[in-house]
């Protein structure tokens, strides 16, 4: 079974558009991007198109590559204090000269649509309500909507990034999966992944997951976005793994669209909460 993130995301965005209209909301998302990385600018454009689609206003602050941390912090302070801005997103990765942790921590937790503020990460760890990181949240929605059983299953996450690997492991744990995390120092990776009922790869390395690493019938979630010979591909060797997996996400068209949908939902939720219309 192909887990169609593109189709599901489109349906969820249409429902969100209706909710925004019926709720009389007028959410506004501010994005901050630093530098000229083509991929980052492409992702920001996609997010703004989604905003337009569902009725969320958006503003983009584009800063040059040589911008200082202090300058970014000042722009974030202004956005924090702006009553018309509901959500703030800083497009990652930032240039190496920027203190990314300081930048993310400067965003007001109640305007943090990405869920990366330390307070919101703490809420994720403890299971308290709060905005969840968009890619992991999108993955969980994709699994739930496709009736993929999680409770009691063995889940393996390849990759320990703060934005995907660690939070998806926590969300799976909260859903009562038995979770194992793997990373660049993990020994016997194949032996571990082959035990997984649910295998999530967020390693950022094209083709790292091959058919001999996958348990027959497993659900395989490919978070990778890699460029190989000018073509977008994931971490999973799709053609061979699809033959033995019970369910698998394609790249493109799997996790990516769900990430965008989750961002839009987070923005609308934050706008509701700031207006006092708690869900």
Swiss-Prot record:
Pathway: One-carbon metabolism; tetrahydrofolate interconversion. NADP(+) binds at residues 159-161, 184, 225. Its EC number is 1.5.1.5, 3.5.4.9. GO terms for cellular component: cytosol. Keywords: Amino-acid biosynthesis, Histidine biosynthesis, Hydrolase, Methionine biosynthesis, Multifunctional enzyme, NADP, One-carbon metabolism, Oxidoreductase, Purine biosynthesis. GO terms for biological process: L-histidine biosynthetic process; methionine biosynthetic process; purine nucleotide biosynthetic process; tetrahydrofolate interconversion. InterPro entries: Aminoacid_DH-like_N_sf, NAD(P)-bd_dom_sf, THF_DH/CycHdrlase, THF_DH/CycHdrlase_cat_dom, THF_DH/CycHdrlase_CS, THF_DH/CycHdrlase_NAD-bd_dom. Pfam families: THF_DHG_CYH (PF00763), THF_DHG_CYH_C (PF02882). Belongs to the tetrahydrofolate dehydrogenase/cyclohydrolase family. NCBIfam families: PRK14178.1 (NF010775), PRK14186.1 (NF010783). This is Bifunctional protein FolD. It comes from Methanospirillum hungatei JF-1 (strain ATCC 27890 / DSM 864 / NBRC 100397 / JF-1). The lineage of its organism: Archaea, Methanobacteriati, Methanobacteriota, Stenosarchaea group, Methanomicrobia. The gene is folD.
